[in-house]
């Protein structure tokens, strides 16, 4: 199987964009001997990959058969994991070597014998989409605030909510709104800059959620 960028889902393109941005940051930090900053960039990417991409892609990973969408999800994750191993190799040599042997050498015995013989990952600028990264960051912020609002109101996530207002001076596309609605178990998310008494009373009487970006 091969990674075919033009056939990837938005979540796949987001992860690859974040991956290339991470490689760019880590490479720059290592060149300037900024080791803690390089490690932090790697950690943040792994957190995003584990806590967001993998969780949002579970249905694709476990889908029956080997449809193209499932292959795309697997290949995107595989590419990200191998890239992380290569980028982190100077800092955590033994762990990344084990990852490389399990992910690469077991599949391709003709591959280089060690991760430490591999070149540092090259940045693919064409895969970096700043707008996509920014929009997904807004989704993540909204989800975090929505969960906090639920906790404050003592409303568990399994209990559906009719409406959530997001205080913001802009709106996200329907694709991202649907992700928020799914993550927070909300029937309708509305972006608004209106903080009128009408919305306040609705919040108090119907236990609506209000978040602010």
Residue ranges and their predicted role:
Residues 1-197, 201, 205:
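Feature 926 captures the class I aminoacyl-tRNA synthetase adenylation module centered on the KMSKS loop
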Residues 203-204, 209-213:
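Hydrophobic alpha-helical segments, chiefly the membrane-spanning helices
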